[in-house]
């Protein structure tokens, strides 16, 4: 499961805390994004399991879809009355490949992976609080 998502506003950083199952789910999602560049799709196989400390209660991956290239990668956050309600992260194809390589290097135990902005953005990863 994804154990926590922490945002560090001062560094514009998004940190995923994952166990082996969460790592595998995230890896499958990103590999699918790399293969299906022209399609928006849902990810019903990813289980909710977010930590309260990062402002999430029960959340899930909603969509990953292509977007228009931008000058640089953006990480934007939406805030509800109880904290963060959504996170969007745009990735270039190069950043997507780098993200996949980082996940592949992670072990099967609990670990944290920090993501920072990079140049360009043909992909957007959107996470949102479940209703």
Question: What positions do the PLM features span?
Answer:
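Positively charged, low-complexity terminal tracts
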Residues: 1-131
């Amino acid at each position: 499961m994804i154990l926590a998502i922490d945002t560090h506003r001062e560094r514009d950083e998004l940190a995923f805390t994952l166990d082996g199952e969460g790592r595998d789910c995230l890896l499958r999602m990103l590999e699918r994004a790399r293969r299906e560049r022209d399609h928006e799709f849902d990810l019903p196989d990813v289980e909710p399991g977010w930590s309260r400390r990062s402002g999430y209660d029960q959340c899930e991956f909603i969509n990953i879809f292509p977007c228009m290239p931008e000058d640089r990668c953006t990480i934007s956050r939406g805030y509800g009355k109880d904290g963060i309600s959504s996170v969007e992260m745009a990735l270039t194809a190069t950043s997507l490949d780098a993200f996949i390589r980082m996940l592949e290097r992670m072990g099967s135990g609990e670990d944290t992976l920090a993501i920072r902005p990079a140049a360009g953005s043909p992909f957007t990863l959107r996470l949102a609080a479940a209703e």
